[in-house]
From Swiss-Prot:
Disulfide bond keyword on record: no
Listed GO CC annotations: plasma membrane
Cross-referenced InterPro entries: NADH_Q_OxRdtase_suD (IPR001135), NADH_UbQ_OxRdtase_49kDa_CS (IPR014029), NDH1_su_D/H (IPR022885), NiFe-Hase_large (IPR029014)
Protein name (Swiss-Prot/TrEMBL): NADH-quinone oxidoreductase subunit D
Species: Delftia acidovorans (strain DSM 14801 / SPH-1)
Described function: NDH-1 shuttles electrons from NADH, via FMN and iron-sulfur (Fe-S) centers, to quinones in the respiratory chain. The immediate electron acceptor for the enzyme in this species is believed to be ubiquinone. Couples the redox reaction to proton translocation (for every two electrons transferred, four hydrogen ions are translocated across the cytoplasmic membrane), and thus conserves the redox energy in a proton gradient.
Keyword field: Cell inner membrane, Cell membrane, Membrane, NAD, Quinone, Translocase, Transport, Ubiquinone
Topology of this chain in the membrane: Peripheral membrane protein
Gene transcribed to yield this protein: nuoD
Length: 417
């Protein structure tokens, strides 16, 4: 009798469900996965090495391009590490703005994940729903930085500028008539804070719509329940963080466990799962979006009542205001030297970590006292999460590997760095 052998299959890197450039070598027994071997490095851009030849400010835009779905969160960790080395205190208003935009970014990330995960399971409607709200969030990015994705808005010592008093508005064109423009601009006539406040009031109903589509949908449950189960103990041993860890029942959240900025002033809950399967990871992320919405609302209320500076008043670290540059030679010199030579950071090393939408995102900087880092190390959450892929897929069907990969929430910009 002929011996039946397992066969290998390449999944990706061009597969639409590979979430980037993942090459997954699967060993299959029929349609059952016996081994899953992730091959990474296809998006390696040497970010850590490039940072060694750039000033601290010049490296900031690289952070946006790591996890390019959670841009400002990457900047946040980088700025915190530099500020720890410099020993500076960020103005309280800037801290609130940072926290607010970190939570806006968290919702952006989870909406992208939810839409693409639903799409992977065959529910393309979910993608249309989530991108509807994501458009408003990207407009919030554009209002403060001029960019919808790679904002470079957080700076060492604060943020680039204060929140604007107006919102960009749509204009009639060949593809948009006056009626559609009026509908699109209906909540854009006030300030940015008014626009964000309006979003926080609308969003809970939108989250209800996502749950109506998926939570009790029998096909969605068949694709996710008891798939890719990881216990709490095993999740910690694997180094999983973020929703991957919390879905297994471990209430570990850097915003609560090791609060940074003004998270200790915020009132929010940490959603945790029970069984640690794909379905729990879905429920945790949807609940996280609701909690992020609560935090954003608290930040909006505080920012409305408390004006103030948004960056440190030290022109060796932060650029002077443009109005002053045009009338004061000293401020012009500060600006010129800051953007040509950068600023020197005291010798030492610092690690700063934040609760990134995907888990613990850390930046480790070693300084030799120069204007460039001697060594920059990035701790991406996706790298540890992806390492569990083999264990989570074993014994499941080939189609289930797609859902396991989806609930890991992998973006290869930060995995490959």
């Amino acid at each position: 009798m002929a011996e039946i052998k397992n066969y290998s299959l390449n999944f990706g890197p061009q597969h639409p469900a590979a979430h980037g450039v993942l090459r997954l070598v699967l060993e299959l027994d029929g349609e059952v996965v016996q081994r899953a071997d992730p091959h990474i490095g296809l998006l390696h851009r040497a970010t850590e090495k490039l940072a060694e030849s750039k000033t601290y400010i010049q490296s900031l835009p690289y952070m946006d391009r790591l996890d390019y779905v959670s841009m400002m969160c990457n900047e946040h960790a980088y700025c915190l590490a530099i500020e720890k080395l410099l020993g500076i205190e960020v103005p309280i208003r800037a801290q609130y703005i940072r926290v607010m935009y970190s939570e806006i970014t968290r919702i952006m990330n989870h909406l992208m994940w939810l839409g693409s995960s639903g799409n992977d399971a065959g529910s393309s409607t979910t993608l249309i729903y989530t991108f509807r709200e994501r458009e408003d969030l990207m407009d919030m990015y554009e209002a403060v930085s001029g960019a919808r994705m790679h904002a470079a808005y957080f700076r060492p010592g604060g943020v680039y500028r204060d929140l604007p008093d107006t919102m960009p508005q749509y204009k009639a064109s060949k593809v948009r008539n006056a009626r559609s423009v009026e509908i699109m601009n209906r909540n854009r006539h006030g300030s940015l804070l008014d626009f964000i406040d309006d979003f926080t009031q609308r969003f809970p109903k939108c989250a209800d719509e996502y749950e109506t589509l998926l939570t009790d949908n029998r096909i969605w449950k068949q694709r996710n329940v008891d798939i890719g189960v990881v216990t709490a103990e095993r999740a910690m041993n694997l180094g999983l963080t973020g929703p991957m860890l919390r879905a297994s029942g471990v209430a570990w959240d850097m915003r609560k466990s090791q609060p940074y900025e003004v998270y200790d002033r915020m009132d929010f809950d940490v959603p945790v799962g029970k069984t640690g399967d794909c379905y729990d990871r879905y429920l945790v992320r949807v609940a996280e979006m609701r909690q992020s919405n609560r935090i954003i609302k608290q930040c909006v209320d505080w920012l409305r009542a408390n004006p103030g500076p948004v960056i440190v008043d030290n022109h060796k670290i932060a650029p002077p205001p443009r109005e002053g540059m045009k009338s004061n030679m000293e401020e012009l010199i500060h600006h010129f030297k800051l953007f040509t030579e950068g600023f020197r950071v005291p010798e030492g090393e610092a690690y700063a970590a934040i609760e990134h939408p995907k888990g613990e995102f850390g930046i480790y900087i070693v300084s030799d006292g120069a204007n460039k880092p001697y060594r920059l190390k990035i701790r991406p959450p996706g790298f540890a999460n992806l390492s569990a892929m083999d264990e989570l897929c074993r014994g499941h069907m080939l189609a289930d590997a797609v859902m396991v990969l989806s609930t890991l929430d992998i973006v290869f910009g930060d995995v490959d760095r």
